């Protein structure tokens, strides 16, 4: 029997390693003078050079990165929400299920992200706050578009974006377009559920409001899920989404209170008091009420 001498692949590995030193590392391409690299594909030069602290305080970088990454996640949320709305509008629900699940998981990610910002203490935030001016997350056009697509509409919220016509156009379109939930209600009407006509065609700039005929339609779905499985699953995807959205809002409130207490927000709002009022917003009222009425 021949003597065992280490790994049977050691010779090949050694040879490959020698070759790798000359041509790459473990077969990896090392020269990108003529090819697209990882950083090129992701536009990292632009992304990583977009942080410009205005104060000398060390902690401002955290504040900037926290909000910039949130905006990137919101960009993906909007990408998915718009596509989900189009799928529902086209009576094609399975693709919407995947998209809505992804949005919920993004919101879960953003809930956890508040834990990073919460490492900023009140004195640390106070040192950089004067440099923020009147800038505030309240002015995020992407967040406002998300709220409008989910049905929480308010025409007064267009004004903070009037100075940027390209942003105003996006938010205004979301205000005037049926929300994701509106399209679900219209789908139920197309499928024969007795939904009031003024829920199918209405002033889309108005926020979602509870309607008894819509709850009755959802109750029919929930009382016989097997007969209406797609709509039943859609309803649960909506509840998952709003559940995650509520947690995101709640962690926003608690993080702000932890860092600034009840001071007014930089954008002029009442800060924590304003954010607490937003916790009372219900996006899909019939889907929550039916849980009591079942």
Swiss-Prot record:
The gene designation is: kynA
What keyword terms does UniProt attach to this protein?
Dioxygenase, Heme, Iron, Metal-binding, Oxidoreductase, Tryptophan catabolism
Enzyme Commission number: 1.13.11.11
What GO terms are given for molecular function?
Answer: heme binding; metal ion binding; tryptophan 2,3-dioxygenase activity
Could you tell me what this protein is called?
Answer: Tryptophan 2,3-dioxygenase
User: Residues annotated as region Disordered?
Assistant: 1-20
Q: How is the cofactor bound?
A: Binds 1 heme group per subunit.
Cofactors demanded by this protein: heme
**Physiological role:** Heme-dependent dioxygenase that catalyzes the oxidative cleavage of the L-tryptophan (L-Trp) pyrrole ring and converts L-tryptophan to N-formyl-L-kynurenine. Catalyzes the oxidative cleavage of the indole moiety.
Task: Tell me its family.
Answer: Belongs to the tryptophan 2,3-dioxygenase family.
Origin: domain of life:
Bacteria
